[in-house]
Amino acid sequence: MWLGVVTLFPEMFSSLKDQGIVSRAVNNGLIEFELYNPRDFAEDNYRRVDDYSYGGGPGMVMKFATLEKAVMKARADAPAEAKVLLMSPQGATLDHELINHLSAEHCQSFILVCGRYEGVDERFIEKCVDLEISIGNYVVSGGELPAMVFIDAMSRQLPGVLGNPDSSCSETYVCLLYTSDAADE
């Protein structure tokens, strides 16, 4: 699986790539990461990626052109046609059913866009985004944490990532778990 992550904070993904099952998947060549900082596609000397909301209101909005250029670069780098996913509190809730659906589509390339500030320019969503994804009915500071949740959940679906291939079929949220040592009580 190929992942292009558009983020203002690429360093946040180093721990995900360096530890746990995602690290194992990266080291075994099952997942490939590319990180794209929108600031690298900004056109001004200040590398500005946000602007005031047209019509006013609090907070800043991520600029259309900067995000579009980052996604276009990621699309060009992707080994196969990539599905563009925007991490957004308005999106479809990321749950086991959605993960299974996306993995069943056999899409092997995803571009994850991590929003910040008040959000992203709606023109970017309309033109570039295939699906908005939310990790729940609350707001976090940016799309990086939801993107990491998506990456971890999707990586569990890849053959060879988990130690036991049956682990992804019987996820632990469906039943109570106990260890075999009753003496611990």
Show which residues each predicted segment covers:
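Thiamine diphosphate
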Residues: 171-177
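N-terminal nucleotide/polyanion-binding subdomain common to many enzyme families
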Residues: 1-75
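Conserved small/polar residues in nucleotide/adenosyl-binding loops
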Residues: 178-183
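Short, solvent-exposed amphipathic alpha-helical segments in soluble enzyme
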Residues: 20-24, 100-104, 128
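A short acidic, often aromatic-flanked loop/helix-cap motif at beta-alpha or helix-coil junctions
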Residues: 39-44, 92, 139-141
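Structured adenosyl-cofactor binding patch, chiefly the S-adenosyl-L-methionine
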Residues: 120, 124-171
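S-adenosyl-L-methionine/SAH cofactor-binding core of RNA-modifying enzymes
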Residues: 63-114
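Hydrophobic/aromatic beta-strand patches that form the interior of the parallel beta-sheet core
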Residues: 4-6, 34-36, 85, 110-111, ...
